[in-house]
Amino acid sequence: MASGSAGKPTGEAASPAPGSAVGGASSQPRKRLVSICDHCKGKMQLVADLLLLSSEARPVLFEGPASPGAGAESFEQCRDTIIARTKGLSILTHDVQSQLNMGRFGEAGDSLVELGDLVVSLTECSAHAAYLAAVATPGAQPAQPGLVDRYRVTRCRHEVEQGCAVLRATPLADMTPQLLLEVSQGLSRNLKFLTDACALASDKSRDRFSREQFKLGVKCMSTSASALLACVREVKAAPSELARSRCALFSGPLVQAVSALVGFATEPQFLGRAAAVSTEGKAVQTAILGGAMSVVSACVLLTQCLRDLAQHPDGSAKMSDHRERLRNSACAVSEGCTLLSQALRERSSPRTLPPVNSNSVN
């Protein structure tokens, strides 16, 4: 399904929450906020690159490799869900500003995690709505699914990379049992999705080499994962610099194995066929994707402003400039939400529509 509950992260590739624990000691809320900013920014940019900047029209699936597909939802349902989520985004944007102004960096970090998940969810829904609107135009031919969903497996790869980056970058003193648990669970969740998706692709593949290569890729990934998770268990049971360094050492092979598997799985022959749409359909799709991009760009800017504020002491000469940038980026988020809502209602770009009550000119 394309929506799910408003404001709730979707799918199994959701963040393993390194941002919720990195540097997570309560005495270091600024450090934690900086880490969350980096994670959220990377996630939002990746999803935008995959769904908004692509020239292809494809449905967006959220429930896993065996999902019946997001196409069960109508454009109208997607539109209403997205508009509801823009309202939730406005509330979170206000909350983050207020918490930061009061010096509540821990609460601001929690709100930012929620904001990042909401932006990802909103982007997914917007991309699916754009697809539905495009294929509803005359002469359009719907997309044909392939053996692999490029978006889902690429998201999983990114989450695995993020989890391994946390293990490499976190000092021993900050490797709390909670952090190690969250990273381990996140890695396991995403690796399971990749395993299931590639097993399904192997079963459905008609090519003998592809069937075997999917299986070998999964085996390689699973072996690397077992070696890394054993190191994580060891650093949890008997913390030491040696145990921590082993986590960093064995994270490399897992990242490489996942990258190789996803690289193979996303070769063109496994991805099906994008929808064929007319010029009219392309214009409708571009309008909605452009509205969503306005929201994502503003939220990325907001995240960068939060990061800058977290890194400077309150008495810093640049503090007032950073706060002004934060206010401006919050306004940009609001404007982006308005543009997206208009694009969904009009099925055209609000930037090219005549102003309300304007007189036409020849």
From Swiss-Prot:
Keywords on record: Acetylation
An MF annotation (GO) of this entry: identical protein binding
Tissues where the protein occurs: Ubiquitous.
One Pfam family it belongs to: Talin_IBS2B
InterPro entries membership: Talin_IBS2B (IPR054082), TLNRD1 (IPR042799)
Record-listed N-acetylalanine modification sites: 2
Ranges of biased composition (kind: Low complexity): 9-27
Stretch list, region Disordered: 1-27
Function description: Actin-binding protein which may have an oncogenic function and regulates cell proliferation, migration and invasion in cancer cells.
Subunit structure: May homodimerize. Interacts with F-actin.
Name of the protein this chain belongs to: Talin rod domain-containing protein 1
Taxonomic lineage of the native organism: Eukaryota, Metazoa, Chordata, Craniata, Vertebrata
Originating gene: Tlnrd1
